[in-house]
Swiss-Prot record:
Highest taxon of source: Eukaryota
Organism whose genome encodes this protein: Arabidopsis thaliana (Mouse-ear cress)
Name by which UniProt lists this protein: Cytochrome c oxidase subunit 6a, mitochondrial
Primary site of residence: mitochondrion
UniProt transit peptide range: 1-36
Record-level GO cellular component terms: mitochondrial inner membrane; mitochondrion
Alphabetical keyword list: Membrane, Mitochondrion, Mitochondrion inner membrane, Transit peptide
Length: 102
């Protein structure tokens, strides 16, 4: 029994003193896995820079062009008919006071 306790204490001391590796082993399914990763990363970095440049050029082009403003709607005579006076006077709340057109 004493030998089991000593053996357990020694194995525990050895496992505590042993350097711990926190890096998990990497599974390579092909012999050139590291090369493919670097190639793919470089490829997508180039695609990203190309995308940023093309989107910036497109934005500059679109924003530099003027845009067409629509025509004013026709002044229909039935739009400002008032059959009853407002309680606050002849002008509407959001109209310019003393507007002669309406």
């Amino acid at each position: 029994m004493a030998t089991a306790i000593v053996r357990s204490a020694l194995s525990r001391a050895v496992t505590r003193a042993a350097p711990k590796t926190s890096v998990a082993p990497k599974r390579n399914f092909s012999s050139s896995a590291g090369h493919d990763d670097a190639y793919e990363a470089a490829k997508w970095e180039k695609i990203t820079y190309l995308g940023i440049a093309s989107c910036t050029a497109l934005a500059v082009y679109v924003l530099s062009k003027g845009h067409h403003h629509g025509e004013d709607p026709p002044a229909y005579p039935h739009m400002h008919i008032r059959n009853k006076e407002f309680p606050w006077g002849p002008d509407g709340l959001f109209e310019v006071k003393h507007n002669k057109e309406h």
